Amino acid sequence: MAARGRRAEPQGREAPGPAGGGGGGSRWAESGSGTSPESGDEEVSGAGSSPVSGGVNLFANDGSFLELFKRKMEEEQRQRQEEPPPGPQRPDQSAAAAGPGDPKRKGGPGSTLSFVGKRRGGNKLALKTGIVAKKQKTEDEVLTSKGDAWAKYMAEVKKYKAHQCGDDDKTRPLVK
């Protein structure tokens, strides 16, 4: 408990002393009385037990990080190429490889990364294209296609009235 009021500092550094006492921090640490001007402050004493995170930066600002990153990526690519490609597995083996918690998930981080930027499902989810059969025109539509604009309009009105309104009470059914 000799360094009760001090913060943990890296080797070779001196903790800043109390205000007005240049280098007074070591004076309190050397005295065995355990009294310091900050002895009533529990927060400071708790901070002395945990190390201060202010370590040395591992990467200089000269592009060395990029070099290390490229090397790491090349190593990962080599590891992927060296691994044997997964052959056809029996259904009981694939379930065991997937794990007990998630039956759809396959082992390894490579399988999840292979879906990034790609459509999932392949041809199963693609829309079917082709020739769509045309609907046969009814007799009314055939007659109105020959007539003038007024006849076309009246035929359309009849068509909507047939679906919407009842002639007996002139009301239309509720629309959900």
Swiss-Prot record:
The modification N6-acetyllysine is found at residue 146. One of its GO terms (biological process) is rRNA catabolic process. Residues 1-12, 68-83 have a biased composition (Basic and acidic residues). Residues 1-121 are annotated as: Disordered. The keyword Ribosomal protein does not apply. GO terms for molecular function: 3'-5' exonuclease activity; 5'-3' exonuclease activity; RNA binding. Optimum temperature is 37-75 degrees Celsius. Coiled coil: none annotated. InterPro entries: TRIR. Its EC number is 3.1.13.-. It is an enzyme of class 3 (hydrolase). Residues 45-56, 90-101 have a biased composition (Low complexity). The keyword Acetylation applies. Optimum pH is 6.5-12. The C-terminus contains a key domain which is responsible for the RNA digestion activity. Part of the telomerase RNA 3' end complex which contains about 488 proteins. Exoribonuclease that is part of the telomerase RNA 3' end processing complex and which has the ability to cleave all four unpaired RNA nucleotides from the 5' end or 3' end with higher efficiency for purine bases. This is Telomerase RNA component interacting RNase. The gene is TRIR.
